[in-house]
């Protein structure tokens, strides 16, 4: 039998004597990747990595399964086979001989070397792991590559039974310590948080590798920001942040990305694929990050706290953005208008205001949006679902942020204070709008006359006055392509176009009546709810629509400061 049941040595199948090998640590020959890091590598980098590791497997005399019956070069070079399938074939051969449920000798949590060593007397068994994956073993050679690669490196070993059994069928493991990380792949648990930036990780080894970036101890140092990396490939990938290189292009829309993982997530916006589904409410998401962020809404968990004011957040990037309000750091500056922004997403959205680009298009009504947040908020208007209800007055809202804002009406809370004049506001958007009175910023520009405004509301009001002028002049520049009818404003044209298609995308869940526009749908909903949000300031009478309130206003004798010159 083999001289050791812990992969420290192997017995030559051609002799009856065991041959003791020189000590070899996996740390000395392996490159460590986390699952996140592996996702960032491009195809050529992964290929190089596989070739190096294949050569390493070939050279390590510790492997219990003989390779002489395989032509490794042929197996790898054959395009119909890949490295994963080759390893999984070996895994399945070994699994056939395993007997789940038996006990095993646990390997101590130290470096695995391949010299003869007495087995630890500690005997343990495991029946708690629920994952559906194969464990990689207990060593730094555990490259955390199970997600994208699936290389079950330690499964080449033949010694001993595999008693650690996954509760999902046909999955066996040699070492109990290797369970901890794969289990978190399924639960989404990331218990190791970086004290510097708040980023979380599945395993202790992953966070150790990450900390190198902050400590500056890695051999590959970024010349732009000083971050250090333990791996050349990760250093090269990081450089793209500074150089702006985006080698991964979407075939459908032409948009480019710095990372292949980001491209894959983006492609789901075209396909509509949302593989990450919430078990509590059934809502699905494009990316695991959005899914984990959503989960915290149910749990109420806010694990990331601002060191200055103690405010807590559901994810680390929100903390980083919030902390810039204390430091007033705004690293992203617009080259067109000079405005500086604190977050990259805000900066990208701002640039689209200049370019007019609206990459997020609603599949139901065709409306385009500058940001993903605006698009997601709009999507909910079609469903009519209002899951967020006020406990005090019973009013329901589509978005949790709208409910929070509404609740401040009851409490009188105004948490957003202007640092220049001390005035407080219920929402950050109102504070932002107020801030422009101090800075003089006017980001909303009329496409027809060039006049700029502080808010979108003011721009829309201005556009309505232009429409009013056209009513007198008779100008109708917006023509329907089907019937040639002209309109004063683009919104009127869009509403008209739906009369040709007969399309009625907004359906009332209570009575089944359908509407061609969201405004008509919202007005109709109020007939069921009895809601009358438009209130006359003079007599207190309330109305379902703003237009009805305006008509009512004419019944009161009052000043009319806006006079038509024509």
From Swiss-Prot:
The KRAB domain, residue ranges: 24-106
Zinc fingers classed as C2H2-type: ranges: 164-186, 192-214, 220-242, 248-270, 276-298, 304-326, 332-354, 360-382, 388-410, 416-438, 444-472, 478-500, 506-528, 534-556
Gene Ontology process terms (BP): regulation of transcription by RNA polymerase II
Single GO cellular component term: nucleus
Pfam families found in the cross-reference section: KRAB (PF01352), zf-C2H2 (PF00096), zf-C2H2_4 (PF13894)
UniProt keyword annotations, A-Z: DNA-binding, Metal-binding, Nucleus, Repeat, Transcription, Transcription regulation, Zinc, Zinc-finger
UniProt-recorded Gene Ontology molecular function terms: DNA-binding transcription factor activity, RNA polymerase II-specific; identical protein binding; RNA polymerase II transcription regulatory region sequence-specific DNA binding; zinc ion binding
Function: May be involved in transcriptional regulation.
The protein's name in its UniProt record: Zinc finger protein 69
Organism: Homo sapiens (Human)
């Amino acid at each position: 039998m083999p001289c050791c049941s812990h992969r420290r040595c192997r017995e030559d199948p051609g002799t009856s004597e065991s041959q003791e090998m020189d000590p070899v640590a996996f740390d000395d020959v392996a490159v460590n990747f986390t699952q996140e890091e592996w996702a960032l590598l491009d195809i050529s980098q992964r290929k190089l990595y596989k070739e190096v590791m294949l050569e390493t497997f070939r050279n390590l005399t510790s492997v219990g399964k003989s390779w002489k019956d395989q032509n490794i070069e042929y197996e790898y070079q054959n395009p119909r086979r890949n490295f994963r399938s080759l390893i999984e074939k070996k895994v399945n051969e070994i699994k056939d001989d395993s007997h789940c449920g038996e006990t095993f000798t646990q390997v101590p949590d130290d470096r695995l070397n391949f010299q003869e060593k007495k087995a630890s007397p500690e005997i343990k068994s495991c029946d708690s792991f629920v994952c559906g994956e194969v464990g990689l073993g207990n060593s730094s050679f555990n490259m955390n590559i199970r997600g994208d690669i699936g290389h079950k490196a330690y499964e080449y070993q033949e010694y001993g039974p595999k008693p650690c059994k996954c509760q999902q069928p046909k999955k066996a493991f040699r070492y109990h310590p290797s369970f901890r990380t794969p289990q978190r792949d399924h639960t989404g648990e990331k218990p190791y948080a970086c004290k510097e930036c708040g980023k979380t990780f599945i395993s202790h080894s992953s966070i150790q590798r990450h900390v190198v970036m902050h400590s500056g101890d890695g051999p590959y140092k970024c010349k732009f920001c000083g971050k250090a990396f333990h791996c050349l490939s990760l250093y090269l990938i990081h450089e793209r942040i500074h150089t702006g290189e985006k080698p991964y292009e979407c075939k459908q829309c032409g948009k480019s990305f710095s990372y292949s993982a980001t491209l894959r997530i983006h492609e789901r916006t075209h396909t509509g694929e949302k593989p990450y589904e919430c078990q509590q409410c059934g809502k699905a998401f494009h990316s695991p990050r959005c899914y984990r962020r959503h989960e915290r809404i149910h749990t109420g968990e806010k694990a990331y706290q601002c060191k200055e004011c103690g405010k807590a957040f559901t994810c680390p990037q929100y903390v980083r953005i919030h902390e810039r309000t204390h430091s007033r750091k705004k690293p992203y500056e617009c080259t067109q208008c000079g405005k500086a922004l604190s977050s990259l997403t805000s900066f990208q959205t701002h640039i689209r205001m200049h370019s007019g680009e609206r990459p997020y298009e609603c599949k139901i009504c065709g409306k385009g949006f500058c940001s993903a947040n605006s698009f997601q908020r709009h999507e909910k208007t079609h469903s009519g679902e209002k899951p967020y209800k006020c406990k005090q007055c019973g009013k329901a809202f589509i978005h949790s942020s709208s409910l929070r804002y509404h609740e401040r009406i009851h409490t009188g809370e105004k948490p957003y204070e202007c640092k220049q004049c001390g005035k407080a506001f219920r929402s950050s958007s109102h504070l932002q709008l107020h801030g422009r009175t101090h800075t003089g910023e006017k980001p909303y520009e009329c496409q027809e006359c060039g006049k700029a405004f502080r808010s979108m509301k003011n721009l829309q009001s201005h556009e309505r006055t232009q429409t009013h002028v056209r009513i007198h002049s008779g100008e109708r520049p917006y023509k329907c392509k089907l019937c040639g009818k002209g309109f004063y404003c683009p919104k009127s044209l869009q509403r008209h176009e739906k009369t040709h298609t007969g399309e009625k995308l907004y359906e009332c869940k209570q009575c089944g009546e359908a509407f061609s526009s969201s405004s008509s749908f919202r007005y109709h909903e109020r007939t069921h709810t009895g809601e009358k949000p438009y209130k006359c300031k003079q007599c207190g009478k309330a109305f379902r629509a703003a237009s009805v309130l305006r008509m009512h206003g004419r019944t009161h004798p009052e000043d009319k400061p806006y006079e038509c010159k024509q």
